[in-house]
Amino acid sequence: MEDERITSAEVQSPDEENEELSLRPQTLHQYIGQDQIKHELEVYIAAAKNREEALDHVLLYGPPGLGKTTLAMVIANEMNVQIRTTSGPAIEKPGDLVALLNELQPGDVLFIDEIHRLPKVVEEMLYSAMEDFFVDIVVGQGPTAHPIHFPLPPFTLIGATTRAGLLSAPLRDRFGIVEHMNYYNEADLANIVRRSAGIFNSHIDDQGAYEIASRSRGTPRISNRLLKRIRDFAEVENDGQIDRQLVSQSLKLLQVDNRGLDRTDKKVLTTMIELYGGGPVGISTIAANIGEEPDTISEMYEPYLLQIGFLKRTPRGRMVTERAYEHLGLIDQYMNK
């Protein structure tokens, strides 16, 4: 398997992460899509500011690449407070958490990405920090060990996760605001593409923007990555102009089809069809046949194929749908099953 997929929803390099910073909106007004979530947050933020209180703790969950980190930064900006960012795996022990909490001023935001990966001992320390704004620290060892009560300023914890089901109930219940971020529609993605093109000083027409949007798997991060690659083709081959024809030609070379499938997605589907008659077949079996880990299949490939109706889950395993056979030009095989 290739190390990097142009249609992956994950950040693929530090350079890409830095470039995302330049594309991020600063306010809810600038933030495109997720309209229901934005409306709710506008109300919660306005109410908290009117009461001069910290915003309630926020949990953002959903697939990768949908803007959870961006939204956390927008929330902090709208609240006119500082944000400290970290991730679950980076907080290895209680002392790491205490150091982060100690930096917070009243009302500040602590953002923890991949919060489902917090060590259990750290998670348990968060309970009192979130609920009552204090932590108890044990200092010393053996008979001399004793707790120290450490008060904290009121703050907002924003947790982000792609796997909300892995959060423990006690942690999940301490979030007053819980928002599920959904895949984006093509109109919103096209607006994101146009906005990013403007920041890149690239010229793109509406049809070009919609063509990129239609192949972006409902994910802004993928839209921006495709735009970057297509911009290269435009500058070299089309006087910097991005139109529908250039987008189609460029993505054909990059092996991204009109539904956003790349060669790995197609390999998953064709392996199931050619070796197992379209299924049902288990994730572990699919993974073994294409040289991937089962978790990689279930987290990176399966969600989008399920979303667009190319796969379905059954009690006996995954099955390729008629829609997928038709897309792959194999409808005769489906009819002859």
UniProtKB/Swiss-Prot annotation:
Region described as Disordered: 1-22
Keywords recorded for this protein, A-Z: ATP-binding, Cytoplasm, DNA damage, DNA recombination, DNA repair, DNA-binding, Hydrolase, Nucleotide-binding
Enzyme class: hydrolase
Region Head domain (RuvB-H), residue ranges: 258-337
Entry binding sites for DNA: 313, 318
Localization of this protein: Cytoplasm
Region: Large ATPase domain (RuvB-L), residue numbers: 1-184
Record flagged with keyword ATP-binding: yes
Protein name per the record: Holliday junction branch migration complex subunit RuvB
